Amino acid sequence: MNFPFNGSVFHHTEKGDNKLTYSSSMYKRLERVIVKHPKEAFINQEHLSKEWKKFNYLEEPNFNEAVSEYGEFISILENYVPQIDYLPASTEVGMDSLYAHDPVKLTSAGALILKSGKKLRQTEAEAYKEYLREKEIPIIGELTGDAVSDGGDIIWLDDKTIAVGRGYRTNDEAIKQLKEMTADLVDEFIVVQLPHDQGEEECLHLMSFISMVDHNLAVVYSRLMPVFFRQLLIERGIQLIEVPEDEYHTLGCNVLALAPRVCMMVSGNENTKQQLEEAGAKVYEYKGQEISVKGTGGPTCLTSPVIRN
């Protein structure tokens, strides 16, 4: 696989107080990312056999295949992202910890520690907190009390606009606290009511039906999208790539921007890929049957962007 990467180092944006600016974007050039290898999350086949039903996977993942797929996934990331940080194995967390996006959300000032709406994932927040401290990534806030939210329900439309999905994984108390914690960082805080869809046990996030690929390009599954939100995107001048129903179910709507109009997705979503290419995007694919489709977590779920510039 050939990558148009010249090996140059990308420079972080500095603020006047000489602090790093962290990620408040879904599409700018990805410079630093946190991931978790399936060797650390899935552990081994025996562990998967015991756990996959409890965590509501579609089927039992094949451990060796998962490791192989992840190698391909990481090789694409490595050609664009100068710094990839790996979460360590932990006996405190489960196999869903492969999806490093959900326990935390980065803002321009640092990290917000979340508490998953999926009870089995709530221990991930504490493990993540320790890791961020070790890496000296500032933590600017943490959900408390009854608040629950997943990172997959929080998207940056631009540096100053945040949209949060209100569904089974993110509740009103979390939205209240997130508003307070981001008050000095955003100009617009948009609450998007999510549909019941397949029910409480299924994982429907705001990011299930929208992926930003550039400031004016998004991959969407409009059938699940509230009318006001779809209209808002169009009014903001964002071109919508419409994912067909069959490809929605194979994670065609889950697209990770490595840079504006440079992205990666699970292979096999040909219609969506073609539309992206027609919009001028470079698309990389990885075989994600074990690490993505079976756990319904695409490339945006597998990654937690720390710095984008």
Regions found by a protein language model. Name each.
Residues 3-309:
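The feature marks the mature, well-folded catalytic cores of soluble enzymes
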